[in-house]
Amino acid sequence: GDIDLLVESRKPNEVMDHFLAWEHTDHSIVRGDTKTSIRGPHGIQVDMRVVEKKSFGAAWQYFTGSKEHNVRLRSRAKKLGLSINEYGVTELNQTDGKILAGKSEKDVYKAVGLDWIPPELREDRGEFELSENGELPKLITLTDICGDLHMHTTATDGEATLAEMAAAAVDRGLSYIAITDHSKRVT
């Protein structure tokens, strides 16, 4: 796996210079005008893309959608006489470079007649039809979580005591927790 970073800046060269100077950089793989890739700790590839504010939403949408979702979104745009890429929504075959939408993800989806589709649903598995009909499901949020059924304390390999974990659970509004420390080996 790799790590992808998306950064908004009017000064991409300064951002990339700073990124390349990161003390954990093993070596640079590639550097372009808006994208830099490095080999970081433990051999992990880290890719960074820098875009302007007017394109951040389009880039965020592009990089958080599956390939299938993005192909379908571009196909929909094309039928409407539009083009979508990581820089924004433009009129198809335009030459002036005017971006119609791109600052926010909601603007990108609105430009093609859709409600915003959350990243978790961007798989081309029915989300377009649901969005067209205003029927996208409500996703689970932190307030929906009632408890935690897998927790380890300092008695084994956890980082907090039982009392600390219980207090943290109360602070977070949890109704229950289950301590699942490892059993001591029986010989």
Name each model-derived stretch.
Residues 1-2, 42:
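A short, glycine/Asx- and small/polar-enriched loop/turn
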